[in-house]
Amino acid sequence: MKRLRCVLAYDGTDFSGFQVQPDQVTVQGEIEAALNRVTGEDIQVFGSGRTDAGVHARGQVIHFDTASNIPMDKWRFVLNNQLPDSIVIRTVEEVDASFHARFDVQVKEYRYCIDNNPVADVFRHRYADHVRFPLDVDAMQQAAHYLVGEHDFTSFCSAKTYVEDKVRTVYGLSVEKIGDEVWVTCRGNGFLYNMVRIIVGTLVEVGQGKRNPAELREILAACDREKAGKTAPAKGLTMWEVVY
C-alpha cells in the first residue's frame, strides 16, 4: 500500500462542489470513480479543502492510498484519460504515509477575478464576476489592509457556518487591477465557509463607493454577518495554491 499526492485543476462550473454528495456530480466523486476504473479498488480521496459549487481550482491537492502497481510516471496519464475534460491531474507523487492533504496544510491561496468592463466578456463569464462600473482599486486595497492578521472572522462567514472557532489568520490580502480585470488575492492558514467570497463582496462595495475603507475594521469587530457585504458569486473564485 502506498500513499499518493496529486495536484489538480478543475472548472467547477458544472460540479456541485468538491465533496461527494448523494445524487450529485462532484469533483471528488469523479476522481474516486476514475480510480475505481483504473485500479479496481474502492479508494477514498482526501482533499486539502472543500470548494463550493461553481468554485474552480488551479492547485487543489488530494491524497489517496492504493495497492496498485501502476508505474509512477503513468499515473497522471492513466487518470486524466478517465476524467472529464473539466478535471485535470497536474502532478502525481508518492509521499510518506503520514502525509494528509487537509491536516498538513500551512497556507492556502485563493484568487478572485472581476471582469470590470462596461460590457461583460462572454469568454470570461465562467471564471469572473462582471462588475460594469469602474472600481476604486486603491480604496479596496486600503480596506483590505484591515483584514490582514489574526482575527475573528464571524462577520465574514456564512450564517450556516457551524464551526465554533472562527479565528483565522490572513497572511496577505491584495487587490490589483490587471488590464480590465480586478484580482483579489487572499492567503491564509484556512478559511471559513464563504469567507473569501464575502470579503470580496464587501471590498467590491468599497470599490463602488458604497462603503468607506475604514468600515472594514468596524465590520470585523462587530462579529455580525449582517454588517458585511454580499457574498460574491462562486464563479470568480479559484483555489490557486496550497502550501505544505
Curated annotation (Swiss-Prot):
Entry annotation: catalytic residues: D52
Xref: InterPro entries: PsdUridine_synth_cat_dom_sf, PsdUridine_synth_TruA, PsdUridine_synth_TruA_a/b_dom, PsdUridine_synth_TruA_C, TruA/RsuA/RluB/E/F_N
Keyword Ion transport: no
EC number: 5.4.99.12
Domain of life of the source: Bacteria
Catalysis: reaction(s): uridine(38/39/40) in tRNA = pseudouridine(38/39/40) in tRNA
Amino-acid positions noted as binding substrate in the UniProt annotation, renumbered to this chain: Y110
Family matches, as PANTHER family: PSEUDOURIDYLATE SYNTHASE, TRNA PSEUDOURIDINE SYNTHASE-LIKE 1
Function: Formation of pseudouridine at positions 38, 39 and 40 in the anticodon stem and loop of transfer RNAs.
Description of how the protein assembles with itself and partners: Homodimer.
HAMAP family: TruA (MF_00171)
Similarity comment text for this entry: Belongs to the tRNA pseudouridine synthase TruA family.
Name recorded for this polypeptide: tRNA pseudouridine synthase A
Gene, per the UniProt record: truA
